[in-house]
Swiss-Prot record:
The gene is aclS. Gene3D superfamilies: Hydantoin permease. Residues 583-607 are annotated as: Disordered. The chain crosses the membrane at residues 67-87, 91-111, 152-172, 192-212, 221-241, 262-282, 317-337, 364-384, 423-443, 445-465, 500-520, 531-551. This is Transporter aclS. It is found in: Membrane.
Amino acid sequence: MTTVIRYGTRLEHLHEAVKLSPHGQTALSVWINDDIRPLPPSRRTWSTMTFIGWWSVWQLSLTNWQLGGSLVASSLSVWQTMVAVVLGRTIAAIVAILIGYIGAEWHIGFPVYSRAIWGVFPYSCHRTVPRQSNVGVILKGAFFPTLLRIGLTVVGFAFQSYTGGLCVTAILSGIFPTFFRMSNTLPASAHVTTQQIIGWAIFNIISIPVLYRRPERSEKLMIGMNIMSFAALLGIMIWSLSHAHGAGDLIHQPSQLQTSDSLGFGIMQGITTVVGTLSIALSRSPFVYPYLKYVSDLDSASQMDFSRFARKPSDQVFGQWFTFIIIGSIMPLFGCLTSSATQAIYGEALWNPPTILAISTSRAAAVFAGIGLVSSQLALNVVDNGKSSPSQSVKGFSNYPVGYSVGMDLSGLLPKYINIRRGCYVGLILGMALCPWELLASATTFVSVISSFSIFMAPFCGIHISDYWFIRQRRLKLSDLYHARPEGIYFYTMGFNWRGVLPWLVGWVPLLPGFMHSINPAIKVSVGADHLYALGFPYGLLSSMAIHTLVNKCFPPPGIGEIDRDDTYGTFTVEEAAKLGVNKDSTEEDSDRSLRRESREVVETKV
């Protein structure tokens, strides 16, 4: 008996130790902490320039550089590719801004807004459901999309850090000839060399202090990384054009699509690739594995997760459309020009910058450019979301939302124990534990499946746009997003909103034949099914948007149009409150007292 009591006491001490410190602005509960509460004005520091710098992290990445090469490899000409890029980027900017308004106007992220769509996760439902059904209850509502995102993000974290480690390996090989000549002490069955695993470990160590910074305090860091990334990629392009004495012949190569039908579908597929999936065709160099396939570009979560830091909604509007359309269209052109020049130099078009560095005779130039590429990869591993499309060889995964995104999702899942910082480190540890080189070498089917998840994520975009703009008409009751009492308008049926299920299923189920064919080409499907899968992102976006609007118009959810009378969480400025009709007299102390009461209620019901 004494042993049992002692064991229970140790568990209680451990439980108290892992809980977040309660000295923040918000009383901790199972629904809220400082990082997932509606952000107060003091934390909303992002200006237009911040958004330009933040989203430039992706636009100045190796992934975006190689996008043009992927489309040219699909038989489009360079200039047809650029038309597809500009049109695709324009559509992407529109979707990003529409979803970004959720965070910019109400200052909440994906895990919290998911409660409005799918239902609050009802920890306090012990009063209304049997205790033995706790597991089923916890998996209801907003937990589903959040768990899906976390799984994808952790895998993305693993692959992204591995790519960064390969860039570190290239730098060390350029600086230290002895490192380059180091004998490999690992067996072939390890699927990784000694040099590569050292570079991977160093990259993960470098990530630790970067992940420590809060998103609202990372502006200067991201600007510095963007400058180094842009300088490296610009330098590679200038060097290539200079040595080739021009852009070469590839830039003038005509399209291989001869009929108007095939050309039209090719351009449409290119636009779809830009909007929903972006490509990297990584070559078989010693430093970079050729792994990529489909991953959603416009994951609905990322936009509102970061737009909630905006000082005002207009900051995210200009910042995103300028970055998506202008900067996002320039880098694929740089990639096409460089590849055309390298074809004239080496007799082969090189689409992957690390490959160019690997064969460069200038060690100093390769090292400095490599540092820029590492900074780009490090920035991606911290903040951004990426995507890819069919590579010419091994299918894989790269650049899915990582770093801050996994921190925000885990914070939304377990707000009493995890904030953004802790979530980032949990994601880093889990990503390292996956040993990405093993997945790339021996789990081809797994990588293909996980990298094709854009078909499951794209409907979330349509559902978010429909729900916020057409159903709720941009009005939310924030206080009901942070409890699971039955009287809340987001409680629905036992914490679950069935209205979101059908639109999500319609958005991806018809794509399953093409999805299965992409994983196993031996599975034969019709041309129509294959084409529908190729256009999966716009189909998922538009179909889920239409069905969600129809279902909610026919079966309206409770509380449409309701908002809080008082500024419960101290969220709004005076101007925002006046525009919404919210009373600013309420204080954050009132909110804290309410949250403490709710926390006590949860404890009492569990006892």
